[in-house]
């Protein structure tokens, strides 16, 4: 087995095909960036809901737009996505002979560029939305938010039953392709690369030199602009390029920070972290009647602040500590993504059901 593994490693190194470690590392790069940015946006939204709340509500769409600008910038200038270029890889058209391959600095052909952009940006966006839909429907089904006569009841229950198997088949498809790639039976580690009609290869020294040369020429060259339309087009092109370059620089710095955080919070370092960051337990608050004079709060503590009736299925918001009826606060949070009393950004997962001794 060791000899066969060494043979595979030697063959992959001799060829321009990257190793499984390189392709898996570049795949995990953007996967780590998304939750990191999401956490930053969440902190901003909680600190100032009026100014940054929209970033949290529309995070998926904003991230997808910025991701598209970033990936399109790299695909058209380096023939690679951001993470692939970061690890010194490029995309080449599958099945093309070596002497007919385009240089990496020329970018991908339009057909392969748009296919690559769709699988890099649009597909992850749809997958995230599908996961959120499944989570929301599962929550509604668990607490019977929909009335029994709802015509969508059969549909969403069938969706919830089928989704785990579809997701398992999807992940199994990718795992099978990676195993075939390790064994040298496939030239694509991901089925999406095959669907896009490209494969990954290592950047050569000539590719790196050509990419640097193109960047220098692009910054030094000033094209004469005649008509107003050309001026607008040139300005938009420069703006998009500037945004993509800023994102690229920021992500390149952030990647090292993310790797440090990953090391810091790894299981091997937990004992050392606990000894370094251990602090004494803070004293309890003097009282818990904060903002008790608010007109939104009822005088009786057993009354729901939303429906003004005796609470049913007591549920507390983890973001503010106020208690409501489950049905009332679920519908409010789902519509407004905020606490009804404080306005703090809130999601459905922040609802915590309470079970009193009387029940």
Swiss-Prot record:
**What molecular functions are annotated in GO for this chain?**
ubiquitin ligase activator activity; zinc ion binding
| Peroxisomal matrix face of the membrane | 1-19, 77-109, 184-249
Query: Using the chain's own numbering, where are the disulfide bonds?
Result: none
Question: Self-association or partners: how does it assemble?
Answer: Component of the PEX2-PEX10-PEX12 retrotranslocation channel, composed of PEX2, PEX10 and PEX12. Interacts with PEX19 via its cytoplasmic domain.
One GO cellular component assignment for this chain's record is: peroxisome
| Name assigned to this protein | Peroxisome assembly protein 12
The entry sums up its family as follows: Belongs to the pex2/pex10/pex12 family.
Q: In which pathway does it act?
A: Protein modification; protein ubiquitination
What does the domain comment read? Answer: The three subunits of the retrotranslocation channel (PEX2, PEX10 and PEX12) coassemble in the membrane into a channel with an open 10 Angstrom pore. The RING-type zinc-fingers that catalyze PEX5 receptor ubiquitination are positioned above the pore on the cytosolic side of the complex.
Name the residues that bind Zn(2+): 304, 307, 325, 328
Where are the bilayer-spanning segments?
A: 20-47, 52-76, 110-139, 145-183, 250-277
- InterPro entries xref list: PEX12 (IPR017375), Pex_N (IPR006845), Znf_RING/FYVE/PHD (IPR013083)
As for membrane topology, the entry says:
Multi-pass membrane protein
Organism phylogeny: Eukaryota, Metazoa, Chordata, Craniata, Vertebrata
């Amino acid at each position: 087995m060791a000899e066969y593994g060494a043979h595979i490693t030697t063959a992959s190194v001799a060829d321009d095909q990257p190793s499984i470690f390189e392709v898996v590392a570049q795949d995990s790069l953007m996967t780590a960036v998304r939750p990191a940015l999401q956490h930053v946006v969440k902190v901003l939204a909680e600190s100032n809901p009026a100014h940054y709340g929209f970033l949290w509500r529309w995070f998926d769409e904003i991230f997808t737009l910025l991701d598209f600008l970033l990936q399109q910038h790299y695909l058209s200038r380096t023939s690679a996505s951001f993470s692939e270029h970061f690890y010194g890889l490029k995309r080449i058209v599958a099945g093309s002979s070596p002497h007919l391959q385009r240089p990496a600095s020329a970018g991908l052909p339009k057909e392969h560029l748009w296919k690559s952009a769709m699988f890099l940006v649009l597909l992850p966006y749809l997958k995230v939305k599908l996961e959120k839909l499944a989570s929301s429907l599962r929550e509604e089904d668990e607490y019977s938010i929909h009335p029994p006569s709802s015509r969508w009841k059969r549909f969403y229950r069938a969706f919830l039953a089928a989704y785990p198997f579809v997701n398992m088949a999807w992940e199994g498809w990718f795992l099978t392709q990676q195993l075939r790639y390790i064994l040298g039976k496939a030239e694509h580690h991901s089925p999406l690369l095959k669907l896009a009609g490209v494969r990954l290869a290592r950047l050569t020294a000539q590719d790196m030199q050509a990419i640097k040369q193109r960047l220098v020429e692009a910054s030094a060259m000033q094209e004469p602009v005649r008509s107003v339309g050309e001026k607008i087009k040139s300005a938009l092109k420069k703006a998009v390029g500037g945004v993509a370059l800023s994102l690229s620089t920021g992500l390149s710095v952030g990647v090292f920070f993310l790797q440090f955080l990953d090391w810091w919070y790894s299981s091997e370092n937990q004992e050392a972290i606990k000894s370094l960051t251990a602090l004494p337990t803070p004293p309890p608050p003097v009282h818990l009647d904060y903002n008790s004079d608010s007109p939104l709060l009822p005088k009786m503590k057993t009354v729901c602040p939303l429906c003004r009736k005796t609470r049913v299925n007591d549920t507390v918001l983890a973001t503010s500590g106020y208690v409501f009826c489950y049905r009332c606060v679920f519908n409010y949070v789902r519509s407004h993504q905020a606490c009804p009393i404080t306005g703090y950004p809130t999601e459905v997962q922040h609802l915590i059901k309470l079970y009193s001794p009387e029940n």
